[in-house]
């Protein structure tokens, strides 16, 4: 593996590790699945990662086409994505992102705690937007639109996939 590909993998992995924030989402996952048994927790973890994988990879491959169909240039989307990533970074610095996630989890539990059967939370709120949020979707599109070589695209996709696999492991442990 060349140094350029290793650098690309590392940059992509670190970027998605911060964006997906598996360690920050794990307590929310644990809270949202607290009412279910081990099989329910495992099912929600696997389904949420499958949903997030489909969404992120779908936008990584088809996002540029979708933007073109809506007459939005990739540069305009990059500018909006940069602003979004900056806002996420500010939230992380001031710990507001974690507070919002915890608030959503408490709100969800408060409205659904009387249900005898736990809800299917794998698509919303876990798969989308907690794992496959706007930041990770936009970043996947950016990384894939910059790469013309399929080897580089494979490196980007493998770094994203490793992050999603790591998120699954963290969910299963939580």
Model-derived features with residue positions:
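Small-residue-enriched transmembrane helix starts and helix-helix packing motifs
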Residues: 1-19, 95, 103, 107-126
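Membrane-interface helix termini and inter-helical loops of multi-pass transporters
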Residues: 2-3, 64-73, 140-153
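Juxtamembrane transmembrane-helix termini in multi-pass membrane transport proteins
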Residues: 6-60
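Structural signature of hydrophobic alpha-helical transmembrane segments
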Residues: 8-25, 74-83, 154-167
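Generic transmembrane alpha-helix signature in multi-pass membrane proteins
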Residues: 17, 26-33, 124-129, 136-146
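Transmembrane alpha-helical segments of integral membrane proteins
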Residues: 27-32, 164-174
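Juxtamembrane helix-boundary/capping and inter-helix hinge elements in multi-pass membrane proteins
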Residues: 31-43, 72-75, 114-118, 144-151
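Membrane helix-loop-helix hairpins that form the core translocation module of multi-pass transporters
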Residues: 39-102
